[in-house]
Design a protein with these regions (language model features):
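Flexible, surface-exposed loop/gating regions in the mature catalytic domains
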Residues: 172
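Bacterial N-terminal signal peptides that target proteins for export
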Residues: 1-7
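Short, surface-exposed "cap/lid" segments of acyl-processing enzymes
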Residues: 87-89, 94-166
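N-terminal cap/lid segment of alpha/beta-hydrolase-fold proteins
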Residues: 23-89
């Protein structure tokens, strides 16, 4: 058993020695998936009526497009993308649920380009569900103030770092 363990460590050391730099997202090699997909959870339909039709130009010099905001909208749903690894372990999947006004992309990579928690758990055989909460990311936004009653919140680039005390500064977890 000891000899097999040492041989395994030698193989891993060789593989890691040949790996690309740590900032390269492919550093751990390809991830083999059995399945991946997405779905929405919850939500409701809302119908808008009596709103003015607008002509808008989306591309400089382009032809105007007529936008009619009247109709049925799907709102307040959560978007979930799932990944099932080829060689799975664990009886239950792992749900990555962000907070603080962020999105599921929080778990895909780190700010400096390294792999995030999504790949970390996939590489260890866990089925992972990565969510975008209501009114965030790929879950979509509802019109304000017609459907969603409060102003949308937009965060600066530094806001999460300051709020969660990451990096340099007083009270930071450096």
């Amino acid at each position: 058993l000891m000899l097999k363990t040492l041989a395994g460590v030698a193989v891993l050391a060789t593989l890691f020695g040949c790996a690309t730099p740590a900032h390269d997202s492919a550093a751990g090699g390809p991830i083999a998936l059995k399945a991946m997909g997405s779905f929405h959870v919850g939500g409701r339909e809302v119908e808008l009526k009596g709103r003015p039709v607008k002509d808008m130009v989306f591309t400089p010099g382009g032809a105007p497009a007529r936008i009619d905001p009247n109709g049925v909208y799907q709102v307040e749903q959560m978007y979930v993308q799932y990944f099932v690894p080829q060689a799975g372990q664990g009886q239950l999947p792992l749900l990555l649920w962000h907070g603080g006004g962020l999105t599921g992309v929080t778990y895909e990579t780190t700010p400096d380009g390294r792999e995030g928690w999504l790949n970390y758990f996939l590489r260890r055989g866990w089925t992972v569900y990565n969510s975008d909460a209501v009114e965030r990311g790929r879950s979509g936004w509802a019109q304000y103030p017609d459907i969603f009653p409060t102003d949308p919140v937009f965060l600066t680039k530094n806001n999460p770092f300051e709020r969660f005390r990451i990096g340099d500064g007083p009270g930071s977890y450096n």
